[in-house]
A protein has these predicted regions:
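N-terminal Rossmann-like NAD(P)+-binding domain of SDR-like oxidoreductases, especially those catalyzing
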Residues: 1-138
């Protein structure tokens, strides 16, 4: 059986929705967006019979996707994406960026699913010469 499903975490965000548009042009795969809509929006939804949008958290990826046999790959863009908010909502930031990302990584490893991960520019800094300046960069 052909693995014909691509999952995009953060598919309702700017980067995720643009990736969905590109994948619709370049592939014949079905696409599933998993987004908690903390910064993504339904206005970014791409209308296509090949795209399905799910509201959920990356930390629950194993519960959400129980049938993995047709999943080809996961593009992981679903993270807490606002540096200034990471100070106000540190627990949400850690929950999404650390726990959620770990869940996605382990899900892919356990199920032999390709992972494409895009780290945040906030992880780039002063070449390690100073401490991380926000919880977002951890």
């Amino acid at each position: 059986m052909r693995k014909n499903i691509i999952i995009i975490t953060g598919g309702a965000g700017f980067v995720g929705s643009n990736l969905i548009t590109l994948l619709l042009k370049l592939t014949k795969n079905k696409i599933i967006s998993l987004d908690n809509y903390s910064s993504g929006t339904t206005k970014n939804h791409i209308k296509s019979k090949r795209v399905k949008y799910l509201k959920g958290n990356t930390k629950d990826v194993s519960k959400i996707f129980k049938n993995t046999k047709n999943i080809n790959s996961i593009f992981h863009f679903g993270e807490f994406s606002r540096i200034y908010q990471s100070f106000k909502n540190m627990n949400d930031c850690i929950d999404s960026n650390s726990i959620g990302t770990n869940a996605v990584f382990n899900f892919c490893l356990r199920n032999d699913i390709k992972l494409i991960y895009s780290a945040t520019s906030a992880t780039l800094g002063n070449n390690g010469n100073d401490k991380n300046l926000s919880p977002y960069a951890f």
